[in-house]
């Protein structure tokens, strides 16, 4: 089994095992490793030893392939110690009921009942095989889930940058990493810019560690055991599985897979057992409760039978067979398989559920808090408008750059509009930029805003000048400062200039002058001019554009370090409005969710005008902006209780930060809401963890956000949340349906034998027949109900309450009615057949046995949906169900028509008229349930009409 090592937590929350785990970690980390060797080598020595280039990485793909053959893939593989054969044999030993059946077969053999002994042995083999296959499917399904979120990284190889799976890395590869990334291997850092890494999942220390490219002097640690540099002191090493909290950097891979510090620890801890999901625990408890009731009933049946003078061996065999059939030991397994297969089905629809319990929660979500950018919108930014104070003077005179509305000269380009302030605005967008061009894909890679700014240069015939200047320092964008700044050294005059881009309000706040359209002159900004800039920015925002401000600061002293305090007295150059259109399917998805009683809240860093415009486009109701929109500033002034009181009317949070998300989730959960929260950044992680369903983005999401989330949208599309909630509700309905099928069959089988014993009638079913019914009840027909296609109308129902039970009052009524129907029909056939000669013959038990099996198949057909008729959902929409029922009926025909099986099940041939009679009677369970569904639908329609009128 190959687990994604980056999804594993090294510190178990169970306090009883914490010391053992910490000791194992310390032992693993004290061993020699590549990180220990390379931390004491200089950058040049490391590059020489690994024969790689500090700018281009490995020089050829062949070299990378050779190293992969030598070192293996960058994966941590946990070998399964137990063979399939051993696992299969363990099923005979671990189940007490199976051991009792084996004992029964042995007793039968010694008493000369060879036929019974052979029959029971064959039945045991079939029952164990079915159970083993179920467990194997469950394990394989869960293994598949571990591979759904592969780790990725930014690789530079052969001078080309690409985004690849971390498993493809080899020693010598050059890797770039930035804030939010998870380190994909053990890496010798060769460049670090304000780099801090969270190593808590490796060392247990909560404080992020500052990293540099400086070599560690080994002689400084001669006082340590064996002169080993402690793992926490290797400041030039970035460890696999740790998280970049601040800044960015690059480095050379020195260790991969198990040859890493993380791998060493992971290997020692792969035997830690994973906890069961709440639903599995519920099923375990339900199974135990039903087992207790079943044991009491079976014990009474056995005792009464023996008192009545029946054969003790016969009663023992029937009792054990009943125990095997009636006790739903397969419930947790089928639930796990259903959940896992549902998760795999969701993955095909672009929603990767990382934790099985989340599937249960999805059906209860009644509030979705969604980011705007990249989730509700397409995340493909294009520069739509550009405005400069001196060149354009008022909000009406804006340079339109939309593809369909471009203002161009006769030559078809925008070069003639390059006034000094326009040129400088575009230059700032060029230099305040970390996007890069991929030769392999011939596109820009990076932040969508950065990409849009670089793409716009060509329209003005301006080159990308980043390789002609030297970036001295960078102040990365974050949600608090809401701007990005770079300190650039111009090689021509050796002067440094700070270039700044960010939210227009923040840029305007720090600006005291503006750039003229000619001659690189600046003038002081007046309050009237600031009002004009604000007016223009708000005008762009009201059109749904994201508005950025641009400014610069010329440093008199080039040695002045770039800090946040330095960002003041800026020279304003211009505004750029970017368009990020809504995703095509978002409006329909929101409409469906609103119909299903889900409150949609949009959270954005944009201005109120931009947010309201987008909300109206995608169908989020904004009746009164004063009530429906809440800004981040107002949110800061409110307590959680105050927010909880007003949030029912709020659909938009504007100028919000990731920190605000935490307040929003707290307020919603305080009200008792079940919250799904989307996020993609490092600072989103707390809110994602606190929410009931944290949803991260697969494309633009940081590794930190993915780690904190319960679900990953691989297409970053909001409408995928709709399909996930739909699947979650559908899976829960399917679990209820197969529970109804299993428990009604179990109750019917128990009651049938109990009634026969109570009224001193011969047993209508023998041990082999009961075991066959168990195979049908726990086997393919039951599992096929778990994969019933989702009914899209589940979204018209309100979210399920968190406290709702699986076995609701309605479900209990349904399964008891079904069981009663099966009992009455089967007893009727048994008594009718026995009354003809007053004896129990092979024909009597064959008719009773076949009647029960037919009832079972019609019951399974009825259980495909709780309220819809089979004629509405269609007979052929669940292929697995049709195959399962077909095989079950074929098996039943073998049991009554093939001599070998006749001797095992004690059956005889039935005529066509017998089969038709049994089909007619057993179909009654299907007809009764269809009538129940019809009554339920009419009642729901009447209730809906009544409430609509009210």
From Swiss-Prot:
Record topological domains on the Cytoplasmic side: 2-92, 134-288, 345-814, 863-884, 931-950
- Its primary localisation, in coarse terms, equals Golgi
Residues where Phosphoserine occurs? 227
The UniProt catalytic activity note for this protein reads: Ca(2+)(in) + ATP + H2O = Ca(2+)(out) + ADP + phosphate + H(+)
Q: Which GO terms describe its biological process?
A: calcium ion transmembrane transport; calcium ion transport; intracellular calcium ion homeostasis; intracellular manganese ion homeostasis; macroautophagy; manganese ion transport
Sites of N-acetylserine modification: 2
Q: Which domain of life, per UniProt?
A: Eukaryota
What are the record keywords, sorted?
A: Acetylation, ATP-binding, Calcium, Calcium transport, Golgi apparatus, Ion transport, Magnesium, Membrane, Nucleotide-binding, Phosphoprotein, Translocase, Transmembrane, Transmembrane helix, Transport
The record's listing under InterPro entries reads: ATPase_P-typ_cation-transptr_C, ATPase_P-typ_cation-transptr_N, ATPase_P-typ_cyto_dom_N, ATPase_P-typ_P_site, ATPase_P-typ_TM_dom_sf, ATPase_P-typ_transduc_dom_A_sf, HAD-like_sf, HAD_sf
Family matches, as CDD domains: P-type_ATPase_SPCA (cd02085)
Protein family per UniProt: Belongs to the cation transport ATPase (P-type) (TC 3.A.3) family.
Query: What's the further remark here?
Result: Present with 6900 molecules/cell in log phase SD medium.
Q: What is this protein called?
A: Calcium-transporting ATPase 1
**What is the species listed in this Swiss-Prot or TrEMBL entry?**
Saccharomyces cerevisiae (strain ATCC 204508 / S288c)
Name of the gene: PMR1
């Amino acid at each position: 089994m190959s687990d994604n090592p980056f999804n594993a937590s090294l510190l178990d929350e169970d306090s009883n095992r914490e010391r053992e785990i910490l000791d194992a970690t310390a032992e693993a980390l004290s061993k020699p490793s590549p990180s220990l060797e390379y931390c004491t080598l200089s950058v040049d020595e490391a590059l020489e030893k690994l024969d790689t280039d500090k700018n281009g990485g490995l020089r050829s793909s062949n070299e990378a392939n050779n190293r992969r053959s030598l070192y293996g893939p960058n994966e941590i593989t946990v070998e399964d110690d137990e063979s399939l054969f051993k696992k299969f044999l363990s099923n005979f030993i671990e189940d007490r009921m199976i051991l009792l059946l084996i004992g029964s077969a042995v007793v039968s053999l010694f008493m000369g009942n060879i036929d019974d002994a052979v029959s029971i042995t064959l039945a045991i083999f079939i029952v164990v095989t079915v159970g083993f296959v179920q467990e194997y499917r469950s394990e394989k399904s869960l293994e598949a889930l571990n591979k759904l979120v592969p780790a990725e990284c930014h690789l530079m190889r052969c001078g080309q940058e690409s985004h690849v799976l971390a498993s493809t890395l080899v020693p010598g590869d050059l890797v770039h990493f930035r804030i939010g990334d998870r380190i994909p291997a053990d890496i010798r850092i060769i460049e670090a810019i304000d780099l801090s890494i969270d190593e808590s999942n490796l060392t247990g220390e909560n404080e992020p560690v500052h990293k540099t490219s400086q070599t560690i002097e080994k002689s400084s640690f001669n006082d340590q055991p064996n002169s080993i540099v402690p793992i926490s002191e290797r400041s030039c090493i970035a460890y696999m599985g740790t998280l970049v909290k601040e800044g960015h950097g690059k480095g050379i891979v020195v260790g991969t897979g198990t040859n890493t510090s993380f791998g060493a620890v992971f290997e020692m801890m792969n035997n830690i057992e994973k906890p069961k999901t709440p639903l599995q625990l519920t099923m375990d408890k339900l199974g135990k409760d039903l087992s207790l009731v079943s044991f009491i009933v079976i014990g009474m049946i056995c005792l009464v039978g023996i008192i009545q003078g029946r054969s003790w061996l016969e009663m023992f065999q029937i009792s054990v067979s009943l125990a095997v059939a009636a006790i739903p030991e397969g419930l947790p397994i089928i639930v796990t398989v259903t959940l896992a297969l549902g998760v795999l089905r969701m993955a095909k629809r672009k929603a990767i559920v990382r934790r099985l319990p989340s599937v249960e929660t999805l059906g209860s979500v009644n509030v979705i808090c969604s980011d705007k950018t990249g989730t509700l919108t397409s995340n493909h930014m294009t520069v739509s408008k550009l405005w400069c104070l001196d060149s354009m003077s008022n909000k009406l005179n804006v340079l339109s750059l939309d593809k369909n509305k471009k203002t161009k000269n006769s030559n078809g380009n925008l070069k003639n509009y390059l006034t000094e302030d326009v040129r400088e605005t575009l230059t700032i967008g060029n230099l305040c930029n970390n996007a890069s061009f991929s030769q392999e894909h011939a596109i820009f890679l990076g932040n969508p805003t950065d990409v849009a700014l670089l793409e716009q240069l060509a329209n003005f015939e301006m080159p990308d000048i980043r390789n002609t200047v030297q970036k001295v320092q960078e102040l990365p964008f974050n949600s608090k400062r809401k701007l990005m700044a770079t300190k650039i050294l111009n090689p021509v005059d050796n002067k440094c200039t700070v270039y700044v881009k960010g939210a227009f309000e923040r840029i305007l706040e720090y600006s005291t002058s503006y750039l003229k359209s000619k001659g690189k002159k600046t003038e002081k900004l007046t309050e009237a001019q600031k009002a004009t800039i604000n007016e223009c920015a708000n005008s762009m925002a009201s059109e749904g554009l994201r508005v950025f401000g641009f400014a610069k600061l010329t440093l008199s002293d080039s040695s002045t370090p770039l800090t946040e305090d330095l960002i003041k007295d800026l020279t304003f150059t211009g505004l750029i409005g970017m368009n990020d259109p809504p995703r095509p399917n978002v409006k329909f998805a929101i409409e469906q969710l609103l119909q299903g009683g889900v409150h949609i809240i949009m959270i954005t860093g944009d201005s109120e005008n931009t947010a309201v415009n987008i909300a109206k486009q995608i169908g989020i109701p904004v009746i009164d902006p004063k009530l429906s929109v809440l800004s981040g500033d107002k949110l800061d002034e409110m307590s959680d209780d105050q927010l909880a009181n007003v949030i029912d009317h709020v659909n938009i949070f504007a100028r919000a930060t990731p920190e605000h998300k935490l307040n929003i989730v707290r307020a919603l959960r305080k009200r008792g809401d079940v919250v799904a929260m989307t996020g993609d950044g490092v600072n989103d992680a707390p809110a994602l963890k606190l929410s009931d369903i944290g949803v991260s983005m697969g494309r633009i999401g940081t590794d930190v956000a993915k780690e904190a989330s319960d679900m990953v949208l691989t297409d970053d599309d909001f409408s995928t949340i709709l399909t996930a909630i739909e699947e979650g509700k559908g899976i829960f309905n399917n679990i209820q349906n197969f529970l109804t099928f299993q428990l009604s069959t179990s109750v019917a089988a128990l009651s049938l034998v109990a009634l026969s014993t109570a009224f001193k009638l011969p047993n209508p079913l023998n041990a082999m027949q009961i075991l066959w019914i168990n195979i049908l009840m726990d086997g393919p027909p039951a599992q096929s109900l778990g994969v019933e296609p989702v009914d899209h109308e589940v979204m018209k129902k309100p979210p399920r309450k968190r406290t709702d039970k699986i076995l609701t009052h309605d479900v209990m009524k349904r399964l008891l009615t079904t069981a009663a129907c099966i009992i009455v029909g089967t007893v009727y056939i048994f008594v009718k057949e026995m009354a003809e000669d007053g004896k129990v013959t092979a024909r009597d038990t064959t008719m009773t046995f076949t009647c029960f099996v037919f009832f079972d198949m019609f019951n399974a057909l009825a259980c495909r949906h709780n309220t819809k008729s089979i004629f509405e959902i269609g007979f052929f929409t669940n292929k697995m169900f049709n195959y399962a029922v077909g095989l079950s009926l074929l098996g039943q025909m073998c049991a009554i028509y093939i001599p070998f099986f006749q001797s095992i099940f004690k059956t005889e041939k039935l005529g066509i008229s017998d089969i038709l009679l049994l089909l007619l009677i057993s179909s009654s369970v299907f007809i009764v349930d269809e009538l129940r569904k019809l009554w339920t639908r009419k009642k729901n329609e009447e209730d809906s009409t009544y409430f609509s009128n009210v």
